[in-house]
Structures are given as C-alpha cells and as structure tokens.
Amino acid sequence: MHTLRWARGLSPVLLAWCAGVAVQLQQTALWPAAAYGAVAGLALVILGWSRAAGLHRHMSICTAALLLSFACTGGHALLQVRVIDPALEGQDLELVGVVQAMPQRQDIGWRFRFEVETAHRVDGGQAVTVPRKVYLGWYGQDGVSDSGWNLSALPEPVQAGERWRLRARLKAPHGNMNPRGFDYELWLWEQGIGATGTVRTGAAHPPPLRLGQTWMHPVEWWRQSVRDRLQNRLGTGDAGVAGIVVALVTGDQAAIDRSHWDVFRATGVAHLMSISGLHVTMFAWLAAVSVAWGWRQSALWGFKGALRWPAPQVGAVAGLGLAVLYAVFSGWGVPAQRTVWMLGVVVLLRLSARQWAAGHVCLLAAAVVLTLDPWALLQPGFWLSFVAVAVLLWTDQRRSGMHPVGASGAPAWCPVWMYSWLRRGWGLLREQSVVTLALAPLCLLFFGQVSVVGLLANLVAIPWVSFVVTPLAMLGVLWPGLAVLAAWALQPLTVLLVWMAAWPGASVQLALPPWGFAALALCAALLWVSAVPRAWKVASLSLLWPALFWTAPRPAMGTYELLITDVGQGNAVLVRTAKHSLLYDAGPRYSAESDAGHRVLVPLLAQTAEKLDVLMLSHRDSDHTGGAAAVLAMQPQVLLSSSLESEHLLWGMASSSTLCSRGQSWVWDGVRFEVLHPALDGSESSVSTRKPNSLSCVLRISDGVHSALLAGDIEAPQEQALVAVGLEPVDLLLVPHHGSKTSSTPEFLAALQPRLALVQAGYRNRFGHPAPAVLARYEAMGTRVIDSPHCGAATWRSDAPEQVLCERERSLRYWHHRPP
C-alpha cells in the first residue's frame, strides 16, 4: 500500500514534468542559457520555500517540476544542434569526414549522414567551421534526365564508417511548410543535423576520394552489410516482400515500396512492417523467457549463482539488455527508444519489488522518454505507443484482478487444454479490439484515416509477423536461407492484405478534426473500454459527433480562397469556393519514389476531405505535373484540364479531360474562372511541337471585386500576347516561371498592377529563382512579394485581400529555419 500511495503522489509531479516539456516546445525562439538557468534556480527556490504540508506542498513541488523540466528542455535544445553560418551557404567547400549512418539508395544516387572532421573553402583554402553532422546527397552528373540528373553516371557505393574527401555545397536545414504537414526540419533537428547539401560532381570538380575504412560507427557498418546481403539474396524475388524483410531486420523503412505502405496503412498494420515497439517488446519477452529457462536449468547443473539470483529477475535484466542491442542494431529509432525506456522502467520496478498501476508505469516511462528526447512529444508514434501500451497494461491488470490465472471453470464437455487455448484466443481478440478502439481517435487526428478492417487484419498479421516472419528474418542474418523462408512467409500475408485493402469501406477517410474534438473522441473511446456503467458508454457516443462530422470551413458564397502550397521548386495552388475546388498544377517530382503529390498534396486534400472538381495542369514540365498521378489516383472523379500533348500518359489516368484554351470560362458559387492562354487555333493546335512553357494554361479568377491570375511558366512572348489582347488589373499574381528573368516583363506588370506577387520556388534552388532583377521590378512598382521559402504555404482570401497567412509564421518554433 505504501508503494501504491507513493506512486500516486509521484504521478502529479510526473504530469507537471511532462507539461513543462510541452510548454518549452511551444517557444518560437530559444532563450539564452542564463535565462534557462534562472528558471531552474527559481524551481529550486520554490522547493526550498515549500515547507508547509498538504496541498500547498504538493502544488509547489509540481510547479518546481514544471519549471525545472522547462529549463532542462531548453538547455537540451541549446546543445542539440548548431546550424551552418548563412555566409557559407551556397559556397563550394572541401570536406573531410566519415559516413555516419547507413546510406539510403535512391534512383538518382545516395543520401547519407556525414560527420565532418575538417572543412575548407575551395576558392581561398582557408579553414571554416561547419556543423559536425550534415546530410548529403550524392547524385549523378547534371543536366541529362527530366529530373536534372544523369542516371547513367550514378556515384559509386558509399559505406558507413568510410572516410571521404569530397566537395559539397551546403545550406541550412530547410523543409516544406504546409498546414499539418510533415515537419522535415523537426526531423533534422532530432537527428542533430545542422546542414544539408549535395556533393559537387562533373568535369569542373574533382571526384570524391575515398580515404579508407575506419572503425567508427561499427553498428551502422554492420547494419549496411546485413542489408546489402539480404537485398542480394532476396533480389530475385518479389521486390516489395524483400524490402519488408530488410526493414524488419535493419529498420530501413525506405526499403519498402510505397504501394505496400499504402496497403499497410489501409489495413492498419503499418506498425508491424518496420522496427516498432511491438517487435522490441516481443524480442525482449522471448529473450527473457529463454534466459530464465536456461538460468533454472543451470541450477540443476550445479551453478550456485542460480540459487542466489531469482530466474525471473535475471531473465528480465537479460531481456532488457538484449532488447537494447536489438534496438541499437535497428538504427535506434524513436519508436524503439521509447520501448526500451518503458521496458527499463518496468524492469526496475520489478527488481525493486514495487507494484505500480499501469497508468503510473506509463507516466514514469513518458517522463523518462521526454527527458532524453523532448521532441518525441510531437511525433504521432509517441502518442500511439503510450496509449496502446497503457490500455493493454490496464486491461491486463483489470482482467488479472477479476479472473485468476488458470484453467479453472472449464465446462465438463470441454477439455482443460482446449478451454485454456480458447481463453487465450478470446483474450487476444479482446485486447486487439480494445487497442483498435482506443487508437481510432488518434489515427483520425494524426492521419485522417481509420482502418475498418484493421482489427481483422491485425488478428492475422500480429502473430504471423511477430512469431513467424520476424524470427525467421532475424535468424536469416546468420543463415541466409531462413531469410528466404521469411520472404515466402510474407507473400501470402501481403496477398491477403492487398485483398482486404480493396474491400469497399476498408478504411474511412475523414477530415482531420481540431485537437479538442479529437480529445473528446479519445475520452469516448476510453470510456468504451473502461469498466463503467453501460449508460455512461451510450452517453459517451455524443462525444464522437464533433470529430466524426467536423468539416473544414469554406469560403462564403461569392468569395474564394487560394492556398499556395509549399512544394519546393514547382507550382501547386488549391483554389476553393463555397462548394467547389480546383487544383492548379501538382508540384514537382523529387525522385522515382517521391513527388509532391504523395508528400504534400494527397495529405493536404485528405485532411480537409477535399473533393476536387478540376485538376488544371498548366503544361507538361515535371515541376508542374510531378504529383498529378497521385492526385488523379486519389481523386478519380476530377476533370483534367491541360495543354499536355495527346499521347501523354496522364490523359489515360483521368476519367474525364479537356484541353485548356483561351475563351473557356465558368462560374462557381458566384466566382468566375476564365482561361486566358493558350489560344489553340491554327498553328498552335499541335501542342507536341511547341515549347512547353509557351503553352502554359493561364487562369484568371474573380469574384467581381477582387481577382487573381495564375500564370504558369509563360515567358516574355506569351506575356506580350496577353497584353495585346487586354489584361485587367489583379490583386494577386502567381509570378510566372517562378520569377525567372525570362518572364515578368515591365509591360505585363504594368497591365496587371498586382498588389501581391506570390513566388513558388525552392530554397536556394539551382536555377536562382526568383531572379534579383525580377524582384527589383516588382518592388519598384510597390508590389508586395512573398515567396514560399520565407512564407511556407500561403493562404489568401478574396474577402480579405490585404492579408496573407504564412504557414511558416503561424507554426514557427525554435527549430524552424528563418531564411535571411
């Protein structure tokens, strides 16, 4: 009882500690170290003053815990990473260093972490200081393929632990910023990466020089060796299944095909297909059971130490130690770290003979995890892991208290062994259903998707992957033939999952609700799995209503909204009226497995449950059509309007399509849409022989008072043609050709007289967009210029034409890059 009472008294302190971490993560800029030291000193002063007993003493301790965790998290952040000096961005530097982690293979080269030892300027030779950890891309030579890289001149393989001398061009860690999108800059911050860049190749630069293999990062070297051996052994089979085996052994999630990830998410088994908490826990359990059994047997063989230390405790410690080794080998990912810390808490409590409730155990583990990795609090996996484990521990404790362990109570007609297995099966089914129900609101909040078939799929997949596939895959490191068996065992499971994912209503896509609505839904789910009266459970259904039926607010009738997304070097603009939506361009293709459609547009459309009416692709360049295939697959009902040549593959992916041409117009909800270019008549009817930029679809949008012009990649001749036929002034202009010096002519701007000019371009892109001369031209007219590197995604509404909401400003935190 004293132990339980002590744990209950500690819980408010742990909650306060976690709250202090959460508060610090809201800071937009870090304070000086002295300020955090002062906060820590204040916490100690409060503890010194708290001599009164009772509530006031507990409140002062909780307040001190909150302040102290705030200060510790701030101090941790100050030590986390040092960003590159802006003066060194874009400069050619000679770097010597070691490949720190297992490189990731892409279709155009390698991506890898590089631990810099020395850095010098190329132009002067003087030594410079750069961040210790940088993230580099080494690609083929410039200028041949559609993506800008020569796929026939790919770089040689890179091995973890190798020391290289190479020439690179670095820049600050910078990622796309879109509403509730993936925070790439946070991911880089967590990894301690202070710069990204590319290895310079081509005739103008000396080739990178391998200086030799070092003994640094031996675990990463071993992981890469295992990965390469598995890929070579399984390469002749199904590439997708081989990638899953590689991911289960080494934690390399990039080895899994994107199509398989889509199936796993739709069936709710994505957590099984990479090194997750479940795998680490299963490994620890098997290790603990095996070591405990061996420890007991050693007593029979005369080992006296087995009589001194109990087998359960030895097994628990050994299981924890082996789980740490497994997690380290898998790459020490955040999910594996969380599980290791939670297992460590459980083992320590067992060694100290303390019995804590499930909530207290999870709370202590959460406090430990957040102390070591505060930014885990912002990851969906943190919440999914802890809620799942807490629910499982709680239901297990409640069931243990209600039903003693054993097979007593079996009916006379049922053998004891059968009754025992039936009880175990029913317990597995119940636990899986409880976890699925409890996690559904969180899945809706984070992903906008709930798998309806997830319960059934996990009932098959969890035991099959955990007790058949993963052990075979791990043993395949020693005996490669077993890895082949693991791949064979995966094939029927993947076929089953693909079939289930194709069921009507296999998964439900809903708009991402606000945090408050999701919290209400989570409360309802927890009530349903709790031992509360049935009337309470029925009443809790009302808490689900706001999350299930929430819809994103839309523009008022007669007005419209533009969301100029942040997709890097490319165009993608979402236009919304009261009841209709149009997507202008679909962003760039980043690589064979990555494009703006999958990374930005599909999640963006899903989070508001957006149904597109029209997808207008201005022209065929890949920085405008790169994500179109993903959008068309997600939105099969959409009308494709473009100037693509007739043989282009995208025409065949659309259920309905039309060429965009001058003179086309329509009205949605009191808002007029008009195509101003191209004029496809006479010699211009053959789009395949024309320069793509000259065929850009130019769209004008107006509510009768305020207007916007989306200009694609038109250049000076097309601008002059538009001026000749007459242009009306606009409030907002999507700057032609990303601000290239071949566009935005003075006559064109004089005719439009835009108040706002939006530039969609990548940060420090290799084309130099927007050109300084073009920016000066806009500024001389008094036009306010906003670009995506500084703004992120920009939202503009016709009923508030002077305001632009920048996602980078709205979501700014101290780890985010502030471009100069």
Residue ranges: model-predicted function:
Residues 5-50, 379-382, 482-529:
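Membrane-embedded alpha-helical segments of integral membrane proteins
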